[in-house]
C-alpha cells in the first residue's frame, strides 16, 4: 500500500467521515450511508462491542478512501462454538484502486477472528482477491425458485399489460392447486411476532445434528428479523404441544403501483427434522399464494432443506453466490460443503435487500 495511505481499525470518532465516504461511493444506494441503518447494522448487533468493531478503513490524510466492514456472529463447528465475522462490504474509492488498499484491509480483518466468512460473486471481483489471500471457495450456494403467478412475476404495467398478466396468472392456476389444502403432518403453523426461549430451546436441541452452522439464538434473530429499520419479515413457526419444532422467515417485496408483489424470498429456515422442513416450506408457499406473489426464491445450502424445496415445487436455478472461508481451526469441517447449513439470512443478501416499508 502507498506510504501516503493509512489503514487501521475504525473507531466511532470516524463515523461521520465513514458515512460521508459511503454516501460518495454508494450514491445510488443512500441506505448504505443512512445513519439509522448503519447504527442498527453495526452497533446494535448483539455480538457487537462498540469499542472493537469489525470495520477497517483506509485514509488519505483525514479522508476515508476505502473500507472493509463485517458483522460479528458465532458459528458452531463440530461440537465447538467459535466467534467469527461475515465480511459484508469491501469497497475502495475509484481514485485509489490498484494501490494495495483492499489487500491490506483484508489482512487486518483476518487478524480479528480465527474463522472468517464471506459470500461473494465473481462480478464483485472479491473472490479473486480473497483467493490470493488464502481464502477458499467452499461452494456455490444453490438458488431455488418457485413460480406461483407468472404474470405477477414477469409482466409489469397497466392497461393491456395488466390483461396479459392476469391471463398468465389464470393459466398457471393448476400449478398452485392442492397447496392450500395441505396441513402439517404433526403440529400447528403459527405466526411468530418475536423470538423467545422456544427458539433457544429449538437451537439447543437441533443444532447438535449440524456440523457447520451460524448460531441461531433468539437475541440475534430478533435483531435481524424484527429490529431492522424499514423492513417487515413474516415468520411462521411449526409448534407441536407448544414446542417450537422449526421456523421459516419470509421477506415480501413491496407491492408496485398496481398492487402486485413480484417476488418473495425465504430468508431463513431452521427445523428439527425433514418432515418439519417440508411442512414449513409448504406453509411459506401457502402464504405467498394468499398474497398472490409472482415467485418465491431462496439461496440455501443443506440437503434436507433442499430436498424439502424440491418436493414443494421449487427448481434449482443458476446462482452467483459463493461461500468463501478462511479458517485457522477445523479446516476438515469448514472446507467441506456437505457439512454446511447456510441460508440467505447468513449473508448480506437479506440485509441489503430493498426495504418494503416506507416512512
Regions from the PLM with identified roles:
Residues 2, 116-176, 224, 234, ...:
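Active-site/acyl-donor-binding loops of N-acyltransferases
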Residues 5-90, 190-269:
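A conserved beta-strand-loop-helix scaffold within acyl/acetyltransferase catalytic domains
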Residues 36, 47-71, 76, 85-89, ...:
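Core nucleotidyl-transferase/polymerase catalytic module
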Residues 61-63, 95-96, 152, 241-242, ...:
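Short loop segments at secondary-structure junctions
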Residues 89-111, 274-286:
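Conserved acetyl-CoA-binding loop-helix of GNAT-fold acetyltransferases
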Residues 111-112, 230, 242, 290:
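Alpha-helix termination/capping residues and helix-transition junctions
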Residues 158-202:
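Extended, charge-rich helix/loop segments that form flexible
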Amino acid at each position: 500500500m502507498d506510504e501516503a495511505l493509512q489503514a487501521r481499525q475504525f473507531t466511532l470518532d470516524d463515523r461521520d467521515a465513514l458515512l460521508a465516504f459511503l454516501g460518495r461511493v454508494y450514491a445510488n444506494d443512500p441506505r448504505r450511508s443512512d445513519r439509522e441503518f448503519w447504527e442498527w447494522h453495526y452497533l446494535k448487533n448483539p455480538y457487537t462491542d462498540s469499542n472493537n468493531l469489525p470495520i477497517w478503513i483506509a485514509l488519505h490524510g483525514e479522508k476515508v478512501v476505502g473500507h472493509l466492514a463485517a458483522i460479528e456472529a458465532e458459528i458452531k463447528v463440530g461440537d465447538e462454538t467459535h466467534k467469527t465475522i461475515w465480511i459484508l462490504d469491501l469497497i475502495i474509492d475509484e481514485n485509489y484502486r490498484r494501490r494495495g488498499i483492499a489487500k491490506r484491509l483484508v489482512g487486518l480483518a483476518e487478524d480479528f477472528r480465527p474463522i472468517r466468512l464471506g459470500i461473494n460473486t465473481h462480478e464483485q471481483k472479491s473472490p479473486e482477491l480473497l483467493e490470493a489471500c488464502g481464502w477458499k471457495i467452499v461452494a456455490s450456494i444453490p438458488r431455488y425458485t418457485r413460480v406461483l403467478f407468472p404474470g405477477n412475476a414477469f409482466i409489469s404495467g397497466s392497461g393491456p399489460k395488466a390483461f396479459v398478466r392476469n391471463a398468465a396468472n389464470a393459466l398457471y392456476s393448476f400449478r398452485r392447486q392442492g397447496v392450500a389444502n395441505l396441513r402439517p403432518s404433526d403440529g400447528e403453523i403459527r405466526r411468530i411476532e418475536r423470538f423467545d426461549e422456544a427458539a433457544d430451546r429449538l437451537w439447543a436441541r437441533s443444532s447438535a445434528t449440524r456440523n457447520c452452522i451460524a448460531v441461531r439464538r433468539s437475541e440475534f434473530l430478533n435483531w435481524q428479523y424484527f429490529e431492522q429499520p424499514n423492513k417487515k419479515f413474516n415468520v411462521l413457526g411449526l409448534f407441536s404441544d407448544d414446542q417450537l419444532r422449526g421456523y421459516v422467515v419470509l421477506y415480501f417485496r413491496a407491492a408496485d403501483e398496481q398492487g402486485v408483489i413480484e417476488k418473495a424470498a425465504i430468508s431463513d429456515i431452521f427445523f428439527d427434522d425433514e418432515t418439519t422442513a417440508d411442512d414449513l416450506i409448504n406453509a411459506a408457499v401457502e402464504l405467498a399464494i394468499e398474497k398472490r406473489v409472482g415467485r418465491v426464491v431462496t439461496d440455501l445450502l443443506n440437503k434436507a432443506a433442499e430436498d424439502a424445496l424440491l418436493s414443494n415445487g421449487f427448481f434449482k436455478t443458476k446462482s452467483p453466490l459463493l461461500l468463501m472461508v478462511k479458517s485457522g481451526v477445523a479446516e476438515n469441517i469448514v472446507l467441506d460443503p456437505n457439512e454446511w447449513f447456510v441460508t440467505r439470512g447468513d449473508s448480506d443478501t437479506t440485509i441489503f435487500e430493498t426495504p418494503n416499508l416506507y416512512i
